[in-house]
Swiss-Prot record:
Domain FAD-binding PCMH-type: 29-194
Pathway: Cell wall biogenesis; peptidoglycan biosynthesis
PANTHER family, alphabetized: UDP-N-ACETYLENOLPYRUVOYLGLUCOSAMINE REDUCTASE
Classification via InterPro entries: FAD-bd_PCMH (IPR016166), FAD-bd_PCMH-like_sf (IPR036318), FAD-bd_PCMH_sub1 (IPR016167), FAD-bd_PCMH_sub2 (IPR016169), MurB (IPR003170), MurB_C (IPR011601), MurB_C_sf (IPR036635), Oxid_FAD_bind_N (IPR006094)
Organism this protein belongs to: Streptococcus gordonii (strain Challis / ATCC 35105 / BCRC 15272 / CH1 / DL1 / V288)
Entry keyword annotation includes Flavoprotein: yes
Residues of the active site: R173, S223, E293
Gene: murB
Keywords from the named record: Cell cycle, Cell division, Cell shape, Cell wall biogenesis/degradation, Cytoplasm, FAD, Flavoprotein, NADP, Oxidoreductase, Peptidoglycan synthesis
Lineage of the organism: Bacteria, Bacillati, Bacillota, Bacilli, Lactobacillales
Name the record gives this protein: UDP-N-acetylenolpyruvoylglucosamine reductase
Molecular function, one GO term: FAD binding
Length: 302
């Protein structure tokens, strides 16, 4: 049993909200409560939180920007840590260092402001820098692995260390920290000098493509499935006749079948059921088993 008075005393000054519904913070607008939702303002507060949780044997996790995640309806036990206030972006020559809570889109606009090229591919990717590094986010032929130099991480024990891009062992939507449990707290990117107008035009072009193809008008978890070798997930889903298929308030997007949108106050179970149905149907129709890109976390509603 957690001693709440001890928690409040030892973590005084840190913004902690009790039994806080996570659907207020997720891109899907679903998710049950976090026992303790924390918003550290700096690395010092973050380390205090993690060391307290470890000492008191309270589970903890970082939710980041919650853009490619489904939080189950039963919520998450222990501490959920948000990096909303860790969002500093700094430029030094041709490198950008961004804290994990900085929005990836904001980081690309800082690059544009300084006429730095190489980050245009990320101009429409929602979510945070930390989450983007964690999953090696990418679009339009670019990915985080192409520009990352190194990142600072918080280990499960509460220590801070630096990991090089090579040590990250990036793969398609994967990195070594998905296995180690290390949490990105900042990342350094190497870019190249470019022409402001050319960079701006490319970002406008990619943003227009995204607006044309993606269902941005509804809450969603972003791209649901990884791209199967030699195929497109959205095309396989469309060919299986699943465009517009709905379970509860969640629907396979009629605009892009690779997305699932919350059109009518859906819940996390609707998402899980629809994902399972799509995987089963596509495999039956095409022989190809889709693999989830979106992470599903938390507990089912009892």
């Amino acid at each position: 049993m957690v001693n709440i008075e001890l928690l409040k005393s030892e973590l005084a000054g840190i913004d902690i909200r009790f039994d806080e519904p996570l659907k207020r913070y997720t891109y899907t607008k679903v998710g049950g409560p976090a026992d303790y939702l924390a918003f550290p303002r700096n690395r010092y507060e973050l380390v205090r939180l993690v060391k307290f949780a470890n000492r008191e044997q309270i589970p903890w996790m970082v939710l980041g920007n919650a853009s490619n995640i489904i939080v189950r309806d039963g919520g998450i036990r222990g501490f959920v840590i948000m990096f909303d206030q860790l969002h500093t972006i700094m430029v030094n020559g041709y490198t950008i260092e961004a804290e994990a809570g900085a929005k990836l889109i904001d980081t690309t606009h800082v690059a544009l402001h300084h006429s730095l090229t190489g980050f245009e591919f990320a101009c429409g990717i929602p979510g945070s820098v930390g989450g983007a590094v964690f999953m090696n986010a990418g679009a339009y032929g670019g990915e985080i692995a192409h520009v990352l130099v190194s990142c600072k991480v918080l280990t499960p024990e509460g220590e801070i260390k630096t990991i090089s891009a090579e040590e990250m062992k990036f793969g398609y939507r994967s990195s070594v920290i998905q296995e180690t449990g290390d949490i990105v707290i900042s990342a350094k990117f190497a870019l190249s000098p470019g022409n402001y107008t050319a960079i701006q035009q490319e970002m406008k072009r990619l943003t227009h493509l995204r607006e044309l193809k993606q269902p941005l008008e509804y809450p969603s978890c972003g791209s649901v499935f990884k791209r199967p070798l030699g195929h497109f997930a959205g095309q396989l889903i469309s060919e299986a006749g699943l465009k517009g298929h709905r379970i509860g308030g969640v629907e396979v997007s009629t605009k892009h079948a690779g997305f699932m949108v919350n059109i009518a106050d859906g819940n996390a179970q609707n998402y899980e059921d629809l994902i399972a149905h799509v995987i089963q149907t596509v495999e039956k129709e095409s022989g190809i088993k889709l693999e989830r890109e979106v992470r599903i976390i938390g507990e089912t509603l009892q």
